[in-house]
């Protein structure tokens, strides 16, 4: 996948662990948001995040580590951040937030997929939008052409949109990012994020190989745009010649 699409960083494997057993070779993170743990994994690091180490209260609730603090549950927090102007809007956003049951998992293991020693539950990819569309197309092919839906609140893009939703609903979901992950990580303006159950990976890779034979390089070559540009330049040249001739 990385070679075909030219991903700038690696795709990330995510495992939900139901015990507190140490993960060999992985660094236990402290005072990290989930999006920051994902950032470190996409840059090649093998990391683990648990209830003690996760610093984002919204993500902590999403993974069933801790209840939402009162300020977020009532909506006051998002008003304070300047994200929404009405508490009832934020309250509704959190009320409808997909989440794991409290205590369902104990740890989250994130690692570069290319260095995987265990099968992940999920694969999360963060990169430029153009690169992600091919993954979505390959996934759609694996689903027999079924249109791909996205579920987002433009909040919790990595933890909920790209991890919890794919896990609970057993499908790909994508997001353009959110206030939190764009503030807390190196996510670039033109990047987005998606996640899908790892069981879909073989079919996605197979169709990416197929796309790479014709559709992908042809699209990136912008042949239709080049033809239009050439035609427009020809019209401009002809117009200039007529102007010079006094026609």
PLM features: what roles do these ranges have?
Residues 2-247:
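Acidic, serine/proline-rich low-complexity intrinsically disordered regions
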């Amino acid at each position: 996948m990385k070679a075909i699409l030219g991903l700038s960083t690696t795709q990330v494997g995510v495992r939900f662990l139901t015990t507190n057993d140490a993960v060999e070779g992985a660094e236990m993170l402290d005072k990290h948001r989930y999006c920051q743990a994902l950032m470190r994994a996409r840059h090649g690091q093998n990391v683990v995040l648990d209830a003690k180490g996760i610093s984002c209260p919204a993500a902590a609730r999403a993974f069933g580590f801790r209840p939402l603090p009162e300020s977020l549950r009532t909506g006051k927090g998002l008003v304070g951040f300047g994200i929404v102007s009405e508490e009832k809007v934020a309250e509704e956003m959190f009320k409808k937030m997909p989440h794991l049951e409290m205590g369902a998992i104990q740890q989250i293991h994130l690692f570069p997929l290319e260095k995987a020693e265990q099968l992940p539950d999920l694969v999360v990819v963060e990169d430029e939008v153009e690169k992600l569309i091919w993954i979505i197309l390959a996934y759609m092919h694996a689903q027999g052409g079924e249109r791909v839906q996205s579920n987002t609140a433009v909040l919790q893009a990595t933890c909920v949109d790209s991890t919890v939703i794919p896990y609970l609903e057993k499908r790909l979901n994508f997001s353009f990012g959110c206030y939190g992950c764009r503030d807390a990580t190196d996510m670039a303006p033109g990047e987005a994020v998606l996640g899908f159950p790892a069981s879909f990976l073989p079919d996605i890779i197979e169709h990416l190989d197929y796309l790479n034979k014709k559709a992908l390089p042809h699209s990136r070559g912008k042949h239709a745009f080049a033809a239009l540009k050439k035609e427009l330049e020809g019209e401009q040249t002809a117009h200039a010649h007529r102007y010079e001739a006094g026609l």
